[in-house]
């Protein structure tokens, strides 16, 4: 009898992102669901699509009654609530259900950008200097310009625009106020590393071919992956951003980038697969910008593109993700083993 796999995902619904024009990042999960379903069917699995909607108690009951041998976790959190992304692996762990991808602890740690950066620093991994600031604490600013101002607990580049990069006090005040008002709480301000930009996907314990992001933008537009660069095809950022995979880099650069990606993967306690985003600073030093557990794996995304470059093909990529989860069956309960000492909630 064929093994039954449940693809668990968040059913797109109205959310706070609708009013900010950022809803496309939420609905994109459906593209991943369709592609993963097709790949799993090709691999001979019996597939059940399992969309989840709030409230948490009812969603937990759905997971507990799946009757599947494996949960393929594509859940990104309920709409407008990225902090709920850890919900599915947490319930699966409680019920001893095998699931793909990262544990809930890693998802929660990576989403809180300051806690993640502290963890990376504890593990000896370079990341841009940073502060948490609100409109009331701007007087404490101590970093060097240019800086980038980000929401503290968002993913998918929510809240990132061309104006997010600031070079003076007036612009800093404006962006901190915008982020604090639009996304709640304090803003993450970090020194902007504006050199070459790379990302690498870790699959199991293997680092896939590195990608480099290139920019062909008008003068004065900061080189960074804004929300528009990822989700708005008609925007200058989308049209002016490109990806080279495999990146044209030396063997030494490949070794450095891949080693940093794997170290970051382990530092955050990831399992299965994750993408690590990195940039060079003005001195040519590689800095980790972000660790993305369970990144978007729709065809054409960074992780899928790197799997293609590795010769896996999309179906082979999904097969490797399943194999990484199956490996955990022999190591139950799932391990959460980030490096470094305990950290505060900052």
Question: Can you say where each PLM-predicted feature lies in the sequence?
Answer:
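ATP-binding N-terminal substructure of ATP-dependent carboxylate-amine bond-forming enzymes
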Residues: 1-98, 105, 109-111, 134-139, ...
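Active-site nucleotide/adenylate-binding loops and adjacent lid/helix of ATP-dependent enzymes
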Residues: 2-9, 64-67, 107-196
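A short beta-strand motif that forms the metal-chelation/ATP-contact edge
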Residues: 3-5, 72, 148, 199-205, ...
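Short acidic/His/Gly/Ser-rich catalytic and metal-binding motifs that mark active-site loops
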Residues: 14-18, 155-158, 234-237, 299-300
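Short glycine-enriched, charge-decorated loop/helix-capping segments at active-site entrances
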Residues: 20-26, 161-166, 304-306
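Hydrophobic beta-strand scaffold residues
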Residues: 47, 98-99, 127, 147, ...
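Phosphate-binding site of ATP-dependent enzymes
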Residues: 169-259, 280-287
């Amino acid at each position: 009898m064929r093994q039954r796999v449940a693809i668990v995902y968040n059913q797109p619904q109205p959310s706070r992102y609708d009013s900010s024009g950022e809803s496309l990042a939420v609905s994109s999960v459906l593209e991943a669901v369709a592609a993963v379903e097709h790949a799993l069917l090709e691999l001979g699995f019996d597939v059940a699509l399992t969309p989840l909607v709030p409230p948490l108690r009812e969603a937990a009951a759905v997971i507990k009654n799946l009757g599947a041998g494996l949960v393929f976790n594509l859940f990104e959190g309920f709409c407008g609530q990225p902090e709920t992304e850890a919900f599915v692996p947490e319930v699966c762990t409680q019920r001893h259900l095998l699931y793909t991808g990262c544990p809930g602890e890693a998802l929660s740690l990576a989403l809180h950008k300051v806690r993640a950066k502290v963890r990376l620093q504890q593990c000896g991994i370079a990341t841009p200097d940073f502060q948490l600031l609100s409109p009331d604490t701007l007087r404490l600013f101590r970093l060097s310009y240019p800086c980038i101002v980000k929401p503290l607990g968002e993913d998918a580049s929510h809240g990132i625009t061309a104006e997010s990069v600031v070079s003076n006090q007036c612009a800093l005040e404006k962006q901190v106020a915008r982020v604090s008002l639009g996304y709640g709480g304090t803003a993450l301000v970090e020194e902007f590393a504006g050199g070459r930009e790379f990302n690498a996907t870790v699959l199991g314990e293997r680092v896939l071919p590195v990608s480099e992001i290139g920019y062909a933008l008008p003068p004065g537009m900061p080189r960074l992956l804004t929300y528009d660069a990822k989700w708005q095809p008609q925007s200058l950022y989308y049209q002016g951003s490109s990806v080279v995979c495999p990146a044209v880099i030396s063997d030494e650069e490949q070794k450095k980038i891949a080693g940093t990606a794997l170290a970051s993967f382990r530092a955050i306690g990831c399992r299965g697969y994750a993408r690590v985003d990195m940039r060079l600073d003005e001195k040519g030093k590689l800095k980790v910008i972000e660790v993305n557990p369970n990144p978007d794996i729709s065809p054409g995304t960074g992780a899928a593109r790197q799997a293609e470059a590795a010769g896996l093909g999309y179906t082979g990529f999904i097969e490797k993700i399943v194999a990484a989860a199956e490996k955990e069956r022999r190591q139950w309960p799932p391990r959460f083993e980030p490096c470094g000492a305990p950290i505060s909630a900052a």
